[in-house]
Amino acid sequence: MKPKDTPRKNTNRDDRSGPVIALFVYGTLKSGFPNHDRFCRNAIDIQPATVWGRLYDLGAYPALEVPEETILAYGTADPRADVATQAHYAAYVPAHAPHTQPSGDWDPVHGELIILPDPARALPPLDYLEGFRPGRSSLYQRVLVPIQCGLRTSPAWVYVMHGPFRGQLLSEGRWPR
């Protein structure tokens, strides 16, 4: 699956008057892919970003594994609570902190930081798409991790899978190849 050409979004701060959710995407939710158009078209900002992890190609979509020690929080069924958790950690993750590699064989995974307005409306369809069912067995988990966007480090939600993985490890950290 190849993305179509979609320009980066940068809108003015007036769009951020209400609560927003920060989401790191690395697969079919990236700009130019059909799921982006369906679920993220209302994004108020999209920027290139990276996270430490391992990216696997599962064919039609990728899976991300992140180091357990980088997980700041686990997503819930309450978008308002998740916005509050994100804000809490944003106050404690220094914006200019070095994005140091965790112990182990982790790679930088490349994707996009997407800022979505109205989390109460935006998160439930994304959770459904990703098979995230808080408190139940789920295909993906939504977790809060530090991401690097330019020279800034900030917390963002990301959908991760727990192994074992049957796909091919993408050591270059990009999907599709």
Predicted regions and their residues:
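Glycine-aromatic micro-motifs
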Residues: 2-177
